[in-house]
């Protein structure tokens, strides 16, 4: 049985972006993984995704009840391995890395605040502060600009596993020792939107968070509360009047990202009263920020602060966003698709409109619509046919997102099996690998044969 997190630990994850657990297997077990890892590096160098085939005992670490419990708590009971893993070697007397966010492999994902992706960092040997441990910046996982380097070092004995929100700022620190430091990094994804807490939750638990009175504060109380409610499978109730809407919409373009984020979630607090002015702001921001977003690395053109606000509004924003899927401007269509997917359960009835956008002339719209349909779930024929068709798209990251969406839909996506079987021969590794994962998730006899 997975050892689930309790409310306090889950709240800490929502706020800080990481949690540490221990796979308390025998020390000799971890020592053998360490020796096997060293042997792979000595004989073949860094084998990237093939490390599991070279060191199959790694699977037992991530199947440990403490690790499964934390991942279940954060990503839900249907979470899956993502087909990306990497062993990081920090050589003796090496310099520290720059603080960074990881890219999404072969994709330009939106950096959603809601935890649908997580990284796990595992040490097969003891790691102290002098050995170049990985560090994480607490409370920075919702920031796309580099925060102050108030980092926390992840140290611990063999078997220590740090699970982090995918968009956490992190780095390898300087290895001041004579000992090589190994860290196995694995990636996991959520396959089901939360409808209830997936951790050891008590209905009486009430998170203690500060009200966001100062838009420049790094205490993002409204944001944390919104993410917490999403994990609990509920939307928050609108609590503020609409008197500040205009000023807050202006603040979405402030120079300081903390101001933009706090303004977004203050607007989200206002519920339906904020939708019309936010949609106007979205139209402007989607065009105004387009050139910069396209030029930036690791950035989807729909990375918009009005988008975070509309996601936080939730259900009341769905009709207006569905209308924006018909915009003449592709960046607005792409943004609307992204936000509907981030809203999740409350936007499920927008699936037919999103399915129409799978045939959009603009690849960013197709990509965002495919991802959104994976979040919304449901295997309606038009959705599955559309996603299956995208597996032959000219653009790799469109095909990739179609395969991931079909993985999330799972058994209801059986109609896409022939297209998924063909995708097993795709030139792109992550398309092939995710097609195999989708076939496994479908679980039909024909899917098993394809695997």
How should these model regions be labeled?
Residues 240-253, 272-293, 315-326, 345-359, ...:
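Amphipathic alpha-helical scaffolding segments comprising HEAT/armadillo-like alpha-solenoid repeats
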Residues 1-110:
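Non-heme Fe(II)-dependent double-stranded beta-helix
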Residues 214-241, 258-273, 291-315, 323, ...:
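Structural detector for internal amphipathic alpha-helices that build alpha-solenoid repeat scaffolds
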Residues 85, 120-122, 184-188:
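A structural signal for short, well-ordered beta-strand segments
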Residues 26-28, 87-89, 104, 127-129, ...:
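Short, solvent-exposed loop/turn segments at secondary-structure junctions
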Residues 144-163, 168, 173-272, 280:
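Conserved double-stranded beta-helix
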Residues 95-155:
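Catalytic core of non-heme Fe(II) oxygenases with the double-stranded beta-helix
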């Amino acid at each position: 049985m997975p050892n689930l997190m309790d409310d306090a630990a889950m709240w800490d994850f929502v706020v800080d972006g990481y949690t540490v657990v221990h796979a308390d297997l025998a020390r000799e077990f971890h020592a053998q993984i360490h020796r096997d890892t060293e042997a792979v590096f000595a004989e073949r160098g860094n084998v990237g995704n093939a490390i599991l085939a070279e060191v199959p005992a790694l699977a037992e670490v991530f199947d440990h009840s403490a690790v499964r419990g934390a991942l279940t708590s954060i990503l839900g009971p249907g979470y899956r391995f993502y087909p990306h893993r990497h062993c990081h070697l920090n050589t003796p007397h090496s310099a520290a890395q720059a603080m960074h966010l990881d890219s999404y492999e072969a994709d330009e994902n939106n950096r959603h605040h809601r935890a649908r992706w997580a990284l796990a960092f595992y040490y097969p040997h003891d790691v102290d502060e002098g050995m170049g441990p990985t560090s994480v910046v607490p409370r920075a996982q919702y920031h796309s600009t580099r925060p102050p380097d108030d980092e926390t070092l992840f140290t611990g004995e063999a078997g220590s596993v740090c699970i982090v929100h995918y968009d956490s700022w992190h780095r390898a620190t300087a290895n001041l020792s004579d000992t090589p430091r190994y860290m196995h990094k694995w990636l996991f994804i959520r396959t089901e939107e939360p409808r209830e807490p997936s951790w050891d939750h008590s209905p009486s638990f009430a998170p203690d968070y500060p009200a966001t009175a100062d838009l420049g504060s790094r205490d993002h109380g409204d944001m944390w509360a919104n993410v917490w409610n999403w994990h609990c499978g509920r939307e928050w109730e609108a609590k503020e009047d609409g008197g500040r809407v205009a000023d807050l919409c202006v603040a979405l373009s402030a120079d300081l990202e903390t101001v933009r984020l706090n303004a977004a979630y203050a607007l989200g607090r206002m519920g339906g009263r904020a939708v019309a002015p936010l949609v106007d702001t979205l139209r402007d921001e989607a065009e105004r920020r387009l050139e910069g977003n396209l030029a930036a690395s690791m950035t989807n053109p729909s990375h918009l602060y009005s988008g975070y606000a509309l996601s936080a509004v939730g259900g009341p924003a769905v009709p207006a966003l569905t209308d924006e899927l018909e915009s003449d401007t592709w960046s607005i269509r792409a943004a609307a698709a992204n936000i509907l997917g981030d809203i999740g359960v409350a936007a499920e009835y927008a699936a037919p409109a999103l399915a129409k956008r799978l045939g959009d002339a603009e690849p960013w719209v197709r990509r965002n619509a495919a991802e959104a349909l994976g979040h919304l779930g449901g295997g309606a024929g038009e959705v599955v046919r559309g996603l299956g068709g995208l597996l032959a798209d000219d653009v790799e990251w469109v095909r990739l997102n179609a395969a991931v969406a079909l993985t999330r839909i799972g058994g209801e996506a059986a109609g896409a099996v022939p297209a998924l079987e063909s995708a097993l021969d795709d030139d792109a590794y992550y398309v092939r690998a995710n097609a195999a994962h989708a076939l496994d998730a479908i679980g039909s006899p024909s899917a098993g044969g394809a695997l």
